[in-house]
UniProtKB/Swiss-Prot annotation:
GO biological process: cysteinyl-tRNA aminoacylation; mycothiol biosynthetic process
Catalytic reaction(s) noted: 1D-myo-inositol 2-amino-2-deoxy-alpha-D-glucopyranoside + L-cysteine + ATP = 1D-myo-inositol 2-(L-cysteinylamino)-2-deoxy-alpha-D-glucopyranoside + AMP + diphosphate + H(+)
Enzyme category, top tier: ligase
Organism in which the protein naturally occurs: Mycolicibacterium vanbaalenii (strain DSM 7251 / JCM 13017 / BCRC 16820 / KCTC 9966 / NRRL B-24157 / PYR-1) (Mycobacterium vanbaalenii)
Entries under PANTHER family matching the protein: CYSTEINE--TRNA LIGASE, CYTOPLASMIC (PTHR10890:SF3), CYSTEINYL-TRNA SYNTHETASE (PTHR10890)
Recorded name of the encoding gene: mshC
GO molecular function (one): zinc ion binding
Protein name: L-cysteine:1D-myo-inositol 2-amino-2-deoxy-alpha-D-glucopyranoside ligase
Highest classification ranks of the organism: Bacteria, Bacillati, Actinomycetota, Actinomycetes, Mycobacteriales
Residues bound to Zn(2+): 60, 248, 273
Cofactor(s) for this UniProt protein: Zn(2+)
C-alpha cells in the first residue's frame, strides 16, 4: 500500500475535530481465523481478500439527518464483521468512515424542522455514535466529517482540473465544477451497468443529468458554486462546497492512500456514488482500481418497501433501544439473513432473534456442555466464507440445542463459545 496522498498538505488548515465512539472489548481467540473471502461487486465473484499486515477499509458514513435506521445498522454491522474477522486472522486494521455533514437533504430537513443545519448534523451524528456503541460496533480509526476535509477536496479538484478530467461549466452565476465521466477508460467497471441504467440511477440518486452546460449528462458534480443561504468555503475556483462523491475520494486518499483493500457501503451506493468516487481517485493516482474489493450490503425493508428516509418507513435503532430491546438481538436479527441479500425486518424477525439470544445465553451458562472446538472452528470458517452468518448462527443453534437437551462434561465449553460469539459476532452472552 502506498502512503496517504499529499492531499492532506494544503494551504487550508485541516481540522481533526470529529471523534468516533468507545470501542468494545474484543476477546482474543486461540490461533488465527482463516483467510477472509468476500464477494467483489466489480468482479461479480467471491474471492480472497489479501491485505498486508495492516488491512485497510473505507466505508461511507451517514448523512446525519435521520439516524440510525436498521438499513444503516445492517451496513455497519456487515463491515464490523469484516473488521473482527481481520483482527481474528492477525491483521491490524485501518478503518476510515466519513460523515456527509454538508448536503442538500440535511439542509432541507433543517429548514423543515426550523433548526440550524450544523445543529441538526451534530445531534444526529451523536445519536449515530450512541447507536453504534450500543450495537458494539468497532469504531473507525479515522472518523471524518466532510466539513473537516474541505482542504483535501479542494486539492483533489484542482488536480482533476489540471489533468483535464474536470471542467467549469459556462455559467457566470453558478460556475460549478464537474468531473468528466469519460476521464478514465475503465469507468463503469465497478457497477457493470449500461449507459441507460447509469442515467436512470444517476437521476434517481442525487445526480443532475439535465444541468445546462454539462459536456455529458453523466458528468458528476465536484464543486457546487456558492448558492444563497447555503454554506460555502473558499477555493481557487470560487466559493462553494463539495459534491458528494469527491468527499469520499479525498478522505480515503488522504487517510489511507492508494491500494485500499475494501471500499464498502450499501448496495444503493454502487452507482453513482462508489463508481464516481473510485473514478475520481483513479484519474489522479493512475491506479487501475481504487479498491481491491468493492463490497456492498443488501437493503433492509419494512412494510413491503426498502427502508429509506425519503419514504419514511424507518425502524430506528434508538427507538428499539428505548423500547427495551437488547442491542444484541438487533445484531442477531440482522445477521439472520446473508449480508448481500435484500431482506425485511419484522416483529417475527425480532422475536426469533430474542429467542435465539435466550437459548445461547442459557446454553453457555451451563456448568457442563458439549465440547466447543468444532463449533468454534465452523463459525470461523462460515464467517470467513463471504460472511455466511446464517450458517454460523445455525452451527451455534445446533451446539446450544445439544447443550440444553443433553448437557455435557466440558466445564469450559460455555465460556469458549461465549468468547467466540463475542469476538467474531460482537454479541455478549
Amino acid at each position: 500500500m502506498n502512503q496517504p496522498s499529499d492531499l492532506s498538505h494544503t494551504s487550508m488548515s485541516r481540522v481533526e475535530a470529529m471523534h468516533s465512539w468507545s470501542a468494545p472489548n474484543v476477546p482474543a481467540l486461540p490461533g488465527r481465523g482463516p483467510q477472509l473471502r468476500l464477494y467483489d461487486s466489480a468482479d461479480r465473484q467471491v474471492r480472497p481478500v489479501a491485505p498486508g499486515a495492516t488491512a485497510t477499509m473505507y466505508v461511507c458514513g451517514i448523512t446525519p439527518y435521520d439516524a440510525t435506521h436498521l438499513g444503516h445498522a445492517a451496513t455497519y454491522l456487515t463491515f464490523d464483521l469484516v473488521h473482527r474477522l481481520w483482527r481474528d486472522s492477525g491483521h491490524d486494521v485501518h478503518y476510515v468512515q466519513n460523515i456527509t455533514d454538508v448536503d442538500d437533504p440535511l439542509f432541507e430537513r433543517a429548514q423543515r424542522d426550523g433548526i440550524g443545519w450544523r445543529e441538526l448534523g451534530d445531534r444526529e451524528t451523536e445519536l449515530f455514535r450512541e447507536d453504534m456503541a450500543a450495537l458494539r460496533v468497532l469504531p473507525p480509526r479515522d472518523y471524518v466529517a466532510a466539513t473537516e476535509a474541505i482542504a483535501e477536496v479542494v486539492e483533489l479538484v484542482e488536480k482533476m482540473l489540471a489533468a483535464g478530467a474536470a471542467y467549469v461549466v459556462d455559467d457566470p452565476q453558478y460556475p460549478d465544477v464537474y468531473f468528466r465521466a469519460d476521464a478514465t477508460v475503465q469507468f463503469g467497471y465497478e457497477s457493470g451497468y449500461d449507459r441507460d441504467t447509469m442515467l436512470a440511477l444517476f437521476a434517481e440518486r442525487g445526480g443532475d443529468p439535465d444541468r445546462p452546460g454539462k459536456s455529458d449528462p453523466l458528468d458528476a458534480l465536484l464543486w457546487l458554486a456558492e448558492r444563497p443561504g447555503e454554506p460555502s468555503w473558499p477555493s481557487p475556483f470560487g466559493p462553494g462546497r463539495p459534491g458528494w462523491h469527491v468527499e469520499c475520494a479525498a478522505i480515503a486518499l488522504s487517510r489511507i492512500g492508494t491500494g485500499l483493500d475494501i471500499q464498502g457501503g450499501g448496495s444503493d451506493l454502487i452507482f453513482p456514488h462508489h463508481e464516481f468516487s473510485a473514478a475520481h481517485a483513479e484519474c489522479v493516482t493512475g491506479e487501475r482500481r481504487f479498491a481491491r474489493h468493492y463490497v456492498h450490503a443488501g437493503m433492509i425493508g419494512w412494510d413491503g418497501h426498502k427502508m429509506s428516509k425519503s419514504r419514511g418507513n424507518l425502524v430506528l435503532v434508538s427507538q428499539l433501544r428505548r423500547d427495551g430491546v437488547d442491542p444484541a438481538a438487533i445484531r442477531l436479527g440482522l445477521f439472520a439473513g446473508h449480508y448481500r441479500d435484500d431482506r425485511f425486518w419484522s416483529p417475527a424477525v425480532l422475536d426469533e432473534a430474542l429467542a435465539r439470544l435466550h437459548r445461547w445465553r442459557s446454553a453457555t451458562a451451563l456448568a457442563g456442555a458439549p465440547d466447543a472446538t468444532d463449533v468454534v472452528a465452523r463459525v470461523r470458517r462460515y464467517l470467513a466464507d463471504d460472511l455466511d452468518t446464517p450458517k454460523a448462527l445455525a452451527a451455534l443453534d445446533g451446539w446450544a440445542t445439544d447443550a440444553l437437551t443433553y448437557g455435557g462434561h466440558d466445564a469450559t465449553a460455555g465460556t469458549t463459545v461465549a468468547t467466540a460469539v463475542d469476538a467474531l459476532l460482537g454479541i455478549a452472552l
